[in-house]
UniProtKB/Swiss-Prot annotation:
PANTHER family: GENERAL STRESS PROTEIN 20U (PTHR42932:SF1). Forms highly stable, multimeric protein-DNA complexes which accumulate in stationary-phase cells and protect against oxidative killing. Induction: By oxidative stress and by growth in minimal medium lacking iron (Fe(3+)), or one of the divalent cations manganese, copper or cobalt. The keyword tRNA processing does not apply. It comes from Bacillus subtilis (strain 168). This is Metalloregulation DNA-binding stress protein. The gene is mrgA. Belongs to the Dps family.
Length: 153
């Protein structure tokens, strides 16, 4: 039987996973919008990059949701829930390519920071699989921060 502290830790892990699931869903939506609306001399490069990133975001949404189910949690699954649980926004004010890229840098930095928190919670809960999942995500996210920041100059 789980102790009260273990149940609390498990709930914290599940809540944090739902926040990240929601962040990745909003990021997926934002990336689609950027993919469709990017304009300017870097259209072809960014159009392709945004597609690559939204494909990765879609995979990440599925991976986090399945991890939640595997540990007995319930992933949020509606747009309303995603919006309520996310710590990033869906934006909407970005019109230039550089504004779009800067918004992504900011979102990825937020996700990276919060993912480190998830790792700590998972490790406290002896949930090595969740911790490992987020270690891998941080590696990819930090790479994207570097690449997108380099684009901005």
């Amino acid at each position: 039987m789980k102790t009260e502290n273990a149940k609390t830790n498990q709930t914290l892990v599940e809540n944090s996973l739902n926040t990240q699931l929601s962040n990745w869903f909003l990021l997926y939506s934002k990336l689609h919008r950027f993919h469709w609306y990017v304009k300017g001399p870097h259209f072809f490069t960014l159009h392709e990059k945004f597609e690559e990133l939204y494909d990765h975001a879609a995979e990440t949404v599925d991976t986090i949701a399945e991890r939640l189910l595997a540990i007995g949690g319930q992933p949020v699954a509606t747009v309303k829930e995603y919006t309520e649980h996310a710590s990033i926004t869906d934006g909407g004010n970005e019109t230039s390519a550089s504004e779009m890229v800067q918004a992504l840098v900011n979102d990825y930095k937020q996700i990276s920071s919060e993912s480190k928190f998830v790792i700590g919670l998972a490790e406290e809960n002896q949930d090595n699989a969740t911790a490992d999942l987020f270690v891998g995500l941080i590696e990819e996210v930090e790479k994207q921060v570097w690449m997108l920041s380099s684009y901005l100059g």
